[in-house]
């Protein structure tokens, strides 16, 4: 999860988030190189008194600054499209969980089980126990098995919401009347925190998301106790 004064991304705990971090570094390096080149050229123009006689008519330069940006855009677009297809592709999910956004809480339904559903509300600050996180703890966590492909179906009962868990690289809009889906796969166990990422009313800031990723045998034990 995030910590105070953090400037970078949260630690990646899913293959998608790892790919997003690599893509971020790849794109940032291209931006850095272009910015350095532009600043260098500007500094030369400002510090030299010489004038190039062919500046106003240079076919070779015009060809270069037309082709080179196109190549750079392709270098950015191809990895981006690859990640987009990875995020959209879901093959044989081991579990499906339906998530519904409400003002201002989330409800979850494990569609592979009968009568396994619950609402998840934020725990008020006055009810927090020592060590619990303000505005992030919920009364019912979403327990899921780790190292298994999980399909999340996301929608809303009232207004537009957004279901987001940064460390897993997940952010999917919850739109009334529309069912969106995303893939969830965690490499290691733990608690993963998120929040509603779309302004949805006065209590928008009080819609936390808590995922508890556990080994399969612990998940089976939990699901048996909940049914």
UniProtKB/Swiss-Prot annotation:
It catalyses: 4 Fe(II)-[cytochrome c] + O2 + 8 H(+)(in) = 4 Fe(III)-[cytochrome c] + 2 H2O + 4 H(+)(out). Component of the cytochrome c oxidase (complex IV, CIV), a multisubunit enzyme composed of 14 subunits. The complex is composed of a catalytic core of 3 subunits MT-CO1, MT-CO2 and MT-CO3, encoded in the mitochondrial DNA, and 11 supernumerary subunits COX4I, COX5A, COX5B, COX6A, COX6B, COX6C, COX7A, COX7B, COX7C, COX8 and NDUFA4, which are encoded in the nuclear genome. PROSITE patterns: COX2, COX2_CUA, COX2_TM. It comes from the Eukaryota. Cu cation A1 binds at residues 161, 196, 200, 207. Its main location: mitochondrion. GO terms for cellular component: mitochondrial inner membrane; respiratory chain complex IV. It is found in: Mitochondrion inner membrane. The chain crosses the membrane at residues 15-45, 60-87. Belongs to the cytochrome c oxidase subunit 2 family. The gene is MT-CO2. This is Cytochrome c oxidase subunit 2. One of its GO terms (molecular function) is copper ion binding. GO terms for biological process: ATP synthesis coupled electron transport. Keywords: Copper, Electron transport, Magnesium, Membrane, Metal-binding, Mitochondrion, Mitochondrion inner membrane, Respiratory chain, Translocase, Transmembrane, Transmembrane helix, Transport. Gene3D superfamilies: 1.10.287.90, Cupredoxins - blue copper proteins (2.60.40.420). Its EC number is 7.1.1.9. Residues 1-14, 88-227 are mitochondrial intermembrane. The keyword Magnesium applies. Its cofactor is Cu cation. It is a multi-pass membrane protein. NCBIfam families: CoxB. It comes from Rhinolophus darlingi (Darling's horseshoe bat).
């Amino acid at each position: 999860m995030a910590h105070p004064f953090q400037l970078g991304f949260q630690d990646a705990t899913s293959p998608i988030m790892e790919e997003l971090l690599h893509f971020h570094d790849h794109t940032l390096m291209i931006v850095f190189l272009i910015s350095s080149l532009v600043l260098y050229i500007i500094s030369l123009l400002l510090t030299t008194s010489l004038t190039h006689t062919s500046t106003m008519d240079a076919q070779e330069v015009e060809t270069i600054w037309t082709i080179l940006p196109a190549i750079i855009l392709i270098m950015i677009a191809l990895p981006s499209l690859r990640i987009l297809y990875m995020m959209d592709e879901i093959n044989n999910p081991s579990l499906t969980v339906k998530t519904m956004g409400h003002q201002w809480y989330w409800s979850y339904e494990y569609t592979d089980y009968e009568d396994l559903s619950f609402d998840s509300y934020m725990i008020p600050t006055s009810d927090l126990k020592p060590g619990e996180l303000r505005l992030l703890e919920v009364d019912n966590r979403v327990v899921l098995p780790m190292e298994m492909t999980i399909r999340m179906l996301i929608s809303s009962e009232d207004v537009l919401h957004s279901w987001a868990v940064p460390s897993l690289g997940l952010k999917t809009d919850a739109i009334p009347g529309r069912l969106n889906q995303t893939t969830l796969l965690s490499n290691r166990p733990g608690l993963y925190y998120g929040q509603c990422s779309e302004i949805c009313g006065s209590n928008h800031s009080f819609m936390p998301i808590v995922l508890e990723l556990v080994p399969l045998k612990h998940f089976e034990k939990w699901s048996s106790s909940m049914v």
